[in-house]
């Protein structure tokens, strides 16, 4: 049955995540020997901190989309495989969650000033998460993490095919439809409190077995930008 197949898949993916995390760490250590360093945003030089403060102020903050979710505000649509910063905001009443999109056409890899032959970088979602308090001014942030939702990609092409539209229009319609299908996975950059997790699971209609906590970047496609700079 499909439900049993999905349960087996979720179980196996959970087993593979520690292997992925260990492999990523080993590769990063090897890259550091080649002077290619994914910097920890909490352990930067003063020069790097000043550079990133200015970068955030001029290149990121003006273009942020931040949402506050509580009884008065609806839950936003989370795009398929897009990264968001999620924060628990201090509130005397019900659970208040803040969400910031990290995909508003930002340059994903931020290269830091470095000596010739060295490549130091962070990812834009790490910068947005670091400065999450600036996206929710007036609120105290109690906890924060990065998250990424994967939506179901299983669509019936024949069912969605309109004979009155040409092939390109049909495919465009199907792709847009797929982007809005139900969530099947929630990735997190760290463990979050049950309060926030349960709120997300309720809104996304997911179960705990569909939650995956990973120590690696939630989207690994950024490596191509690093490779391009290294080989240029």
Describe each region flagged by the PLM.
Residues 1, 38, 49, 58-62, ...:
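Long alpha-helical segments found as membrane-embedded helices
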């Amino acid at each position: 049955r499909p439900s049993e197949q999905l349960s087996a898949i979720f179980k196996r993916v959970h087993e593979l995540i520690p292997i992925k995390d260990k492999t990523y760490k080993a590769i990063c250590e090897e890259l550091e020997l080649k002077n290619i360093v994914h910097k920890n945003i909490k352990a930067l030089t003063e020069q790097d901190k000043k550079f990133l403060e200015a970068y955030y102020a001029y290149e990121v903050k003006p273009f942020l989309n931040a949402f506050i979710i509580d009884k008065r505000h609806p839950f936003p649509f989370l795009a398929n495989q897009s990264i968001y910063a999620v924060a628990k905001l201090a509130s005397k009443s019900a659970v208040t969650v803040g969400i910031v999109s990290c995909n508003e056409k930002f340059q994903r890899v931020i290269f830091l000033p470095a000596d010739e032959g060295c490549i130091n970088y962070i990812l834009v979602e790490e910068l947005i998460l670091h400065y999450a308090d600036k996206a929710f001014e007036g609120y105290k942030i109690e906890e924060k993490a990065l998250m990424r939702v994967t939506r179901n990609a299983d669509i019936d092409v024949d069912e969605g095919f309109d004979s009155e539209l040409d092939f390109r229009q049909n495919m465009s319609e199907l792709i847009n439809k797929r982007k809005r299908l139900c969530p099947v996975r929630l990735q997190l950059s760290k463990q979050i409190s049950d309060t926030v997790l349960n709120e997300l699971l309720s809104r996304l209609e997911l179960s705990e077995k569909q939650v995956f906590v990973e120590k690696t970047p939630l989207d690994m496609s950024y490596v191509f930008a690093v490779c391009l700079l290294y080989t240029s």
